[in-house]
Amino acid sequence: MHKPKLANAITAAAIASSISTKNNNNNSIVGGSSSSSSGGNKSKRPRQFGQYSIGVGTGAGAGGLLRSDDSGFDHLDYSSLIGDSIDLEHYISAMEARRHDQEPDVWAQLQQKESDILLAAELGKALLEKNEELVKQQEKLIEDYSSKIEKLEQEKHVLRQKLAIAEDESDQRVLELQSDLTELKDKLQTQDTAIRQAEKEKTILIDELQHQNTRLTEQIQEAHATELKLSAQIQELKDQYHYRNSSLQEHVNSLESIKTELNLTTGKRQELERRLQIAQEEKESLTSSLEESSDRIHMLERHAREQETKLETTLQALERSQRENNVLSERLGADTNSSTPGRKSLQFEMECDEDDGSYTETGKPNQMFVEARSVYIQLKSLVDSLKVSHDDDSGLNSDISLELESMDNTISSSERHEDGHLAIEFRQGMLSSMSDELTRLLLNLDAGNFKKMLDQTRNLVLEQEDEIKRSHQLIQQLEAKVTVTDVELQNVKEERDQARGDLEDNTDRDELLSKAQTERDAANDRRTKAEVELAKTRVELMQANSQLLESIQQKVELSQQLEQWQMDMHELIDEQMRSKLINNRRAMAAESSAPSPPSSAAANLAKRVTSYKLWSLFQR
């Protein structure tokens, strides 16, 4: 168990000494007149107080054995000690005041001393309690200190572990640094070798540079000699400059005139570009018109193919009717041969009485005659429909239409009966003539259509050729203007070169020279731009020429094809007319002479159909 602190012991000793001093003073004041009993009491009380004070002193002495480590404890109860010391100071000051103001009464003094002793005892008791409390606080601090020591030991252990880890890491780092050091040493050796090699190369290079230096010194000497020569030439040029200085203003004026000419040439070039643009637009329009004409040609070819299909259908119907006609003619020939073997003419039979040729014994018409008449009516209706369609399409081939109308009138005049009903005077050769008429009508219709198409294409080609000629003339004019501008540009270049030579001689007038140089540079830039643009225009003109030549070649080929087609059409029309005349002559001869067999008309029709098919194949 620890002892109380020294400060509390000192305060208790101070209280005891103050009380004893007060008692001594009182004893000295009272003197020796006091009785023995009172002296005994006095001796006892101070002795008791002295014992108490000794006890306190021993406590204080024991408290002096405390360690210096407990100095932190004084800070904890410093405020309480200050309060106790203040109370004791008040008590001591009160005792001293009573000592000075004491009464001469001894019993009062004794009572006062007893009360003081009791007070001192109470103070001692309070001090002991305070000491016990301080001891408890000290034990608590010791426990806290031990816990802190344990924590510090743990931290120390952790730090030792960290130190071991750090030592291992440092060892590894040392090994790595040693390996890096060896690598750096190797690199240093390689660098040393490289430096030695570089020094060798440097020495070689220095030797070469020395040789070059000697050679350059020789060249410098030569250049110095040439410099002297050039200085002499410069002096001569200066003399020439002084001589030509008077004509500098004239050169400036010539430069201004050159500038104006350049502006004019640029304006002309822009005009040429505009015209070239117009020519390109015209070329594009020509190409578009050419495409339109090609589209029209394709459309006409498609229309021709449609007409050809229609013609094939009509020809098939015609062949079918021709076959029926042949069958009927054979049957009629057989009937006439059996009835009148002496006569072989179908026309003679048709001119005979109706009761003999067209009717049987019962009064009914002959079946062969009825079939032949129906075939003839079908062919006539087909011819009439083709004539109507031909009149609706166009008014071409008026001679053919007039001929057909005259034939129709002759036929219609013989078709009326007395009572107004349709009656056909069926004779020999009418079916063959009707089939021939149908073929001629079809051929004439197609010939008229193709003639119209040919005229349209010819007009279109002529218009395109005229446009191409105009564009070609425009291109020739543009080329002539370009050549003129080239000549003008060449003249400007020559004047520019002359002005440049004159300006290079003028070395004194720096401002004028710089101004002329700037103008010259601007003129050079404009000239280069003009040359570039002229080159572009030339290239474009060449392209336009090539395109126009290609288009002209295509037009020429197309015109040749059209001419060939026209010639073929003329030949075909001539052949048709010749065949028509021959057929008419044959028909007239057949009417006047003996009748030919019916198969001859069918063969003639078959020949005409084959010729028409060949013509349609040629059209394709």
UniProtKB/Swiss-Prot annotation:
A biological process (GO) of this protein is:
protein transport along microtubule
Q: Where is composition skewed (Basic and acidic residues) in this entry?
A: 493-503, 509-528
Which molecular function term from Gene Ontology is one that the record holds?
A: cargo adaptor activity
Bias category Low complexity: which stretches? 23-41
Q: What happens when the gene is disrupted?
A: Viable and fertile. Post eclosion discolored, short and brittle posterior scutellar bristle macrochaetae; this phenotype is more common in females than in males. Pupal to adult lethal when combined with mutations in BicD.
Which key words tag this protein in UniProt?
Answer: Coiled coil
Entries under InterPro entries matching the protein: Spindly/BICDR_Dynein_Adapter
Where does the record place the region Disordered?
A: 23-53, 493-528
Q: Which domain of life is it from?
A: Eukaryota
Cysteine pairs forming cystine bridges in this chain are none
From the UniProt record, list the coiled-coil ranges: 120-331, 461-575
Q: Name one GO cellular component term.
A: cytosol
Q: What's this chain's function?
A: Functions redundantly with BicD. Involved in formation and/or development of mechanosensory organs during metamorphosis. During macrochaetae development, together with BicD, involved in Rab 6 and Spn-F stability and distribution and actin cytoskeleton organization.
| Quaternary structure and interacting proteins, as annotated | May homodimerize but does not interact with BicD. May interact with eEF1gamma; The interaction is probably indirect.
Q: Which family does it belong to?
A: Belongs to the BICDR family.
Q: What is this protein called?
A: Bicaudal D-related protein homolog
